[in-house]
Amino acid sequence: MWEDLKSSDNEVYEILQKELKRQEYGLELIASENYASKSVMEAAGSIFTNKYAEGYPKRRYYGGCEYIDEVETLARDRAKELFNAKFANVQPHSGSQANMGAYLALMKPGDTLMGMSLSHGGHLTHGAPVNFSGMLFNVVSYGVDEETETINYDEVERIAKDAKPKVIVAGGSAYSRIIDFKRFREIADEVGAYLMVDMAHFAGLVAAGIHPNPVEYAHVVTSTTHKTLRGPRGGIILTNDSDIYKSINKIIFPGIQGGPLEHIIAAKAVAFKEAMSGEFKEYQKQVVRNSKALSNELASKNLRIVSGGTDTHLFLVDLSELNITGKALEKALGQCDITVNKNTVPKETLSPFVTSGIRIGTPAVTTRGMKEEEMKEIASMIAKVANNVLDEEGNIDKDLAQEIKKDVVSLCQRFPMYADLIE
């Protein structure tokens, strides 16, 4: 697949092969990661990368865009069909760019943005001080209830009435429960705010019809195209409002982006078609079944699951009672070729670089074909490591690490992904 690269730049090729082996022989449990199909990767690596195409279909600033127009229109039409939306912009380079585009289409710098606190499951772009969203807008945050660790909608309503935000954001990067979009829209309407839903994490579940579709309720919906959607790295914006759509288009180009990445847009089109298949719907159902099975199995091994479980593809493990940090367990699991990420939890007392928890997701292992029985194996490995972390650097007994690595490789070999590409 990469013969020309191998002959022209062996240094990059060797690094690529090392990453390929890491992905093939390791357990990927980062909730925001997945394995794109070869079709998606072929489109992303295609000759579409050669073409500049500032503007939109039929309204370009460069000549020679007739076939670029075809592929971008196809991507837009498929996105609209997939999510039952009237309008779609497929040009955002990322989820963060999509969020910036949506914000600037709905409000001005200095206006009030209301989003979920990062430490309670939100995202950097939902108002974190270090992010553009926190720098450009007056931010008011809501979180989860201390007891249930789920969203208290009455409290969200109280905060919204007090703050009178211009935009309310629903969605997050580490919230494991289904969100009541209807309730959020009622709150937004009550205070005269726009409702924006960031469905970057659960878009694949929405596409498969096993999660409520926020397009029915939100003024604007943003998403990434990787994660559960299993496409290339990129973003999209959806709306049913023609005026908002016009504003979004102006903000994306020429407002915050120049030439779109048409090779990635082509790959988005491929991913959207894949997401319309019956196989994809069954895949998403299995993602959730695996997530529930893995969280339940870990809970049975005395690891505390935030909110007591999950409705989606991800969940948080609170490590406070084990007296280890998320940073330490992330490193310890990494030594065993199991990849997770440290994550803040509700009532967090440590810095975001250390944290009291880890986030776990099942999209990637489910893409490999793993099911509930394999989740039991994975839970046993995680629990064994969690109970044997020696220090803050995440060191564990070398013999134990080798034993678990061997089990990881054995499991991965039963469910190959890109094995035929390894040299």
UniProtKB/Swiss-Prot annotation:
Which keywords annotate this record? Amino-acid biosynthesis, Cytoplasm, One-carbon metabolism, Pyridoxal phosphate, Transferase
Kindly state which reaction or reactions the protein catalyses. (6R)-5,10-methylene-5,6,7,8-tetrahydrofolate + glycine + H2O = (6S)-5,6,7,8-tetrahydrofolate + L-serine
- UniProt cofactor(s): pyridoxal 5'-phosphate
The yes or no answer to whether the keyword Zinc-finger is present is no
**EC numbers, comma separated:** 2.1.2.1
One of the protein's GO biological processes: tetrahydrofolate interconversion
Pfam families attached here? SHMT
Disulfide bond residue pairs: none
Gene Ontology cellular-component annotations: cytosol
> Matching HAMAP family, A to Z?
SHMT
Q: Function, please?
A: Catalyzes the reversible interconversion of serine and glycine with tetrahydrofolate (THF) serving as the one-carbon carrier. This reaction serves as the major source of one-carbon groups required for the biosynthesis of purines, thymidylate, methionine, and other important biomolecules. Also exhibits THF-independent aldolase activity toward beta-hydroxyamino acids, producing glycine and aldehydes, via a retro-aldol mechanism.
- What family does this belong to? Belongs to the SHMT family.
Protein name, entry field: Serine hydroxymethyltransferase
The organism encoding this protein is Petrotoga mobilis (strain DSM 10674 / SJ95)
